[in-house]
Amino acid sequence: SSLPDGGAKTAFLFEPGNSPSRARMLRAVKSKLPQANFYTHDPLDLGIHVRAATKAFGKPKPVRPRFHFDKAKVILSLDCDFIGSEDDAHRHIRDFTKGRKLNGGNPEMSRLYVVEALMTQTGANADHRLRSKLSDVYGFAGAIAGRVGVDGFSDGGISDVKWVEKCVEDLKKAGKGALVVAGHRQPMAVHVLAHAMNQTLGSLGETIELLPADDLGVPVAGSLAELKSAIGGVDTLVMLGGNPVYDAPSDLGWSEVQGKVKTVVRLAYREDESAEGCHLHLPKAHYLESW
């Protein structure tokens, strides 16, 4: 029923990913339904890293930062559990471990500074850990950025000046071997500050590089929140995986939003909370069926 209008009242909701096969299929769908809109949903908003890097460096197309912890001499983590809950943690563990081993080719260990609210795996491995409220991380980031040389930032009433000064001293000493990272729970402003420090220290192209963001195959109109705002103009919703009724923020009230759509089609592994409000549920092949 959506074909005559080019899919103007059709929306697709899917999980972020880097599958070239899926990207190819989505492009094929877009060619058949040029007016359809595509949205993504991930209960953990790891996309902040892409959005922040793209904004901080003024790139015309989305880019994602790749961190080289094996090359870093001094690391500052701003509420970033990079060897625990962050994206690419498996690679970060391997690279970070290389920098912590003392051998003939690496006579010095890397040094890790961590500002965080809750104890994390990364914090447990820190040489210098500062416990802070989540809301205060930006203040510490600004104080460090100002001392490193980023314009327009000062102390902002921080409590532990000595800790900050020692961190800044080591970051400046490391220069291009320094690396500042921000976690996915932190707002855009903290991520932009982290990238500003990396650029000021000369780390860009050394301990951090910018790569093209994962190709989703089609332009993305937004996240679940944007889809909620546009739901009045949607007659057909196609859900490719995910379980937003279960894991979306409660203030979105996604179960009620989904119930407003005339036709909901879902491809997923099992009949779960989101399946209850669907008109058609299609079984998704798991990895043993699709390899």
Question: Could you say what each language-model-derived stretch is?
Answer:
Residues 1-291:
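Cofactor-pocket helix-loop regions in the catalytic cores of large enzyme subunits
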